[in-house]
Amino acid sequence: QGRLEALFNYQTLITELTGLPVANASLLDEGTAAAEAMILSYNNSKNKNTFLVDIEVFPQTLEVLQTRAKPLGIEIKLIDWYTITELEDFDDAFGLLVQLPNNKGRLRDPNAFLRIADVYKCMKIAIVDPMCQVLMQPVGEMGFDVAVGSMQRFGVPMGFGGPHAAFFACTDKYKRKIPGRIVGQSLDSQGNKALRLALQTREQHIRRDKATSNICTAQALLANMAGFYAAYHGAEGLNKIATRILKYRQTLQKALRWCGIEVDESEGFDTVRFKSFLVLEGFNVRYEDGHTLITLDECTT
């Protein structure tokens, strides 16, 4: 019961952050969670095989999506914020995925994407940063059907890339199609409240080849770490942490401008993008299109 209660706390955290009513007890990582969201939307569609993906999703996530899509005959179509007026390209789309903030650290208004998804009856999926969700409008309130992401920022070290628990939340409409474990509240034989794994008829140990997913596990340890991180800090503490990160970004932007460096002025949360001189000086930094990106967190000094 203690283990289930900890995971139930984690699920509650995810629903409060995303504004979506149903969340599972975690998945393996952000990339596979995005792929599971794609499969959910694909299985929910009728005779459509195109999945629209924000061109600025993280590259590792895009590679997982492409790998998972290929054997199913799904076409991944990358779309740009500036070319989404080409409505004729979206007739065969069953789902749309947006990253907030995106691969360049930009946090843009997704309403244009959401309008297109509504016109073509696509499922709307958001990959979100949970710490950013502390300050921004929950994606569920924006109109997204599914939200996925990584909980690494909630008290879990980077660990050379992993492991990190992923989250998966959705509207009530899809609760019987969501992948992974779900902890639910029930009553025991004496009528007392008790926790148990719920809606297990979705899973392959019961449904076998007709299961909603062949993901039958969770990153329970990492999910519990993230859940207790949130419980320790509380809502007010998380808000202070997220606000501090945002202020660090603003401070770094101001310092770079003062040094005469051209800074990307797009809205964002924790990442500063600027014209790079660091590569020429021999620094080992992320470098693309003549720009360097620096991402900050609560450990920044």
Q: What positions do the PLM features span?
A:
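Glycine-rich ThDP/TPP pyrophosphate-binding loop and its adjacent helix/strand module
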Residues: 67, 72-74, 79-83, 267, ...
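Conserved N-terminal alpha-helix of the aminotransferase class I/II PLP-enzyme fold
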Residues: 1-33
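Conserved PLP-binding catalytic core of the aspartate aminotransferase-like
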Residues: 257-281, 296-299
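PLP-dependent enzyme catalytic core of the Aspartate aminotransferase-like
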Residues: 12, 283-301
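Conserved PLP-enzyme active-site core in the AAT-like
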Residues: 32-194
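Active-site C-terminal subdomain of aminotransferase-like
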Residues: 154-259, 264-266
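Short acidic (Asp/Glu) and glycine-rich catalytic loops that position anionic groups and cofactors
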Residues: 45-47, 93, 146-149, 201-208, ...
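Hydrophobic alpha-helical scaffolding
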Residues: 27, 51-58, 100-104, 125-126, ...
